[in-house]
Amino acid sequence: MFGIKYSIIELRSINYGDIDMKNYYGSLCTEMYEILHKDAPEDELDFYLSYTRKDMSILEPLCGSGRFLVPFLERGYDIKGIDLSKEMLAKLKEKSPNAKVFQSDILEYDTVEKYDYIFISSGSVSLFTDMVLCRKFLKKMKWLLKKGGKFVFAVDTVANRCPDDSDYRTAIAIKTKERYDLILKNKNYYDEKTHTQFSPGIYELYKGAELLQQEIMDFQTHLYELGELEQYLQDIGFTSVTVYSSYEKVIAKNNHTEMFLYECSF
């Protein structure tokens, strides 16, 4: 996100029992992301589209503001989305009022429907820094998937580690459509033991020198090494797990890439 080692992470929200609401995306964060990254990157969109057929039922958990879901709808696919953030889903509905999306904790999403294809783009699975919750989440994805279907997702790797900072600094400063100044200040700390990248941020909206609104975000990501997830995915029932290092589906061989792309089926 925002060109400071966040470029891979899509703007989505998770909660799943985290009472401090870490990684919850509020209105200022949503507005900044929509200005900077309104559309899905073409190569990434093409990668996720490559798994589709028009007769598929598709689910995008953590769908955010719809950078991927809306282009899928525009191409005629039967797709549904889930996200916790009402701010993000409001943006999505502005783009596609008839989109089938649900504001929900995915672990509490109650449905009998199974899907042919489930995808989570842009490294958003890395937002789960509690590995117990992450495993529950992945198990839920397997439960929602039809036999023979595909579950495809991306995670950030240890190559995305940021240098530690002692103080907050201005990382992004942009103008809104009202010509207000929207500023992000952040700092970084990496926990070697847990592979957690902590990047707390402060979003501020100014009209001249007047502070109109401030929003604090406890942004955290888990940075993966190759081999960290594969065994668990097999343990929960996926019989085929392939790991790529690029949208061209090059097989991952080491940690010298900023993302891993997982293709799972059973």
What kind of feature is each model-predicted range?
Residues 12-64:
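Conserved class I S-adenosyl-L-methionine
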Residues 66-108:
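Class I SAM-dependent methyltransferase SAM/SAH-binding core
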Residues 110-118:
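A short acidic, Gly/Pro-enriched loop at the edge of an enzyme's catalytic core
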Residues 120-122:
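A short beta-strand submotif of the Rossmann-like class I SAM-dependent methyltransferase core
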Residues 135-147:
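A short glycine-rich, Lys/Arg-flanked "PGG" loop and its adjoining helix->strand segment in the class I
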Residues 152-227:
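SAM-dependent methyltransferase
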Residues 220-266:
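C-terminal lobe and adjacent flexible extensions of AdoMet/dcAdoMet transferase-like proteins
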